[in-house]
Amino acid sequence: MEVTSQARGMGLEMYPGTMQPAAPNTTSPELNLSHPLLGASLANGTGELSEHQQYVIGLFLSCLYTIFLFPIGFVGNILILVVNISFREKMTIPDLYFINLAVADLILVADSLIEVFNLHEQYYDIAVLCTFMSLFLQVNMYSSVFFLTWMSFDRYIALARAMRCSLFRTKHHARLSCGLIWMASVSATLVPFTAVHLQHTDEACFCFADVREVQWLEVTLGFIVPFAIIGLCYSLIVRVLVRAHRHRGLRPRRQKALRMILAVVLVFFVCWLPENVFISVHLLQRTQPGAAPCKQSFRHAHPLTGHIVNLAAFSNSCLNPLIYSFLGETFREKLRLYIEQKTNLPALNRFCHAALKAVIPDSTEQSDVRFSSAV
């Protein structure tokens, strides 16, 4: 029993039948599992990574995220806010959605730094901090996903029902929709929190992130339903574009639009699927009998996996600026005008304009069905 407790203290799982009884040792009264080399060999022998190996892998992935994805998400979302606000007199309905989406994504990207440095999942051991972080992240997670879903629906309505929806797709209704989305995001977080908090007031280790009902709601309302709506809307958009371009024969324009649609759906699915699969596996597993209440969290048992899926989910907020704005002609033109206004050096203007064209070439095709940055 002493050996098992020491092994668990080092993050090693001991199962019946995985280790044979050691031969009697007359030179040492007990087996010293505190030695790092012996602990690592035991971990490797059972097919698991040692705590040090998990830390190194998590640190490496965190460095990759911080160096490559975080700057794209942080700078990209700030540029979306600054450029669109600078041209507020020319702001369109999709621009309003872009601004609100950028706000939610920017907060998520900033919060991701906390997760990057949370390699040992320390804040999950502090009930107040764990609950606060979970509430803050869920509000912005829901708002980001809800805005992506609503933008997909709005794009389909704009393309397929252009004549009928002209009276309803106004800036006033767009602002109202943004307000309702933020209210829905807050309600989807605070209402379950209030309900479950009343049931767990006597638990010292209660954390909002570990409540099964909340996790089921997060998987359903934060992934399954939005992905189904996004997939349905963009499949209908594809059908509209195929019909429109089939009569005009503009295949390059159609292929560009279809590639952007494919990128939108794939990025959302790839980034959010690991997080929701991780939560679903936890929900489908039964809690081990006799486990301490504070150690029943699935993240305690699999800290490295939890760290990886969190970084993947944050990556969606980093990639959204590239997909929704920088790949769109409207925003690129606004960005070029913004650079020209803020800089007085003609050479610098020409360099920035050439750089934008080199990275994302302009499209010269024309079409009656405009598939702009609002896709």
Curated annotation (Swiss-Prot):
It is found in: Nucleus; Cytoplasm, Perinuclear region; Cytoplasm; Cytoplasm, Cytoskeleton. It is a multi-pass membrane protein. SUPFAM superfamilies: Family A G protein-coupled receptor-like. One of its GO terms (molecular function) is chromatin binding. InterPro entries: GPCR_Rhodpsn (IPR000276), GPCR_Rhodpsn_7TM (IPR017452), GPER1-like (IPR047143). One of its GO terms (biological process) is cellular response to glucose stimulus. It holds the Pfam family 7tm_1. G-protein coupled estrogen receptor that binds to 17-beta-estradiol (E2) with high affinity, leading to rapid and transient activation of numerous intracellular signaling pathways. Stimulates cAMP production, calcium mobilization and tyrosine kinase Src inducing the release of heparin-bound epidermal growth factor (HB-EGF) and subsequent transactivation of the epidermal growth factor receptor (EGFR), activating downstream signaling pathways such as PI3K/Akt and ERK/MAPK. Homodimer. Heterodimer; heterodimerizes with other G-protein-coupled receptor (GPCRs) like CRHR1, HTR1A and PAQR8. Interacts with RAMP3; the interaction confers proper subcellular localization and function in cardioprotection. Interacts with KRT7 and KRT8. Interacts with EGFR; the interaction increases after agonist-induced stimulation in cancer-associated fibroblasts (CAF). Interacts with EGFR and ESR1. This is G-protein coupled estrogen receptor 1. The lineage of its organism: Eukaryota, Metazoa, Chordata, Craniata, Vertebrata.
